């Protein structure tokens, strides 16, 4: 019975992969647009590094507290969830910052292509969170 959630989560991750490919294939626009987008991406990466450093320190403490209070299984479950959350957040941020400039370029062609690309870029994070979360929980109990 636990095989079904694992299969669903794998499909979610595969779908996220195809969404990422679609976003990456879209044109990025002019040199100035790309330059601004790179600045936004650098700021986002800097923010995530700082945030993840602080969260990692808290996570290490919580891991040991959970280990002492509830045992290794609960502590490992927390650690797996934290890693899956960090991975989906990082990948989602990278795709979102890539999608920004591509959506701006798509806006030159019309509303339909703009919204289509924006929804694809934004939904990557959702599919990653759902897929990695479900895979982590189901895999943990498999």
What residue ranges belong to the model's regions?
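Hydrophobic packing and interface segments
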Residues: 1-142
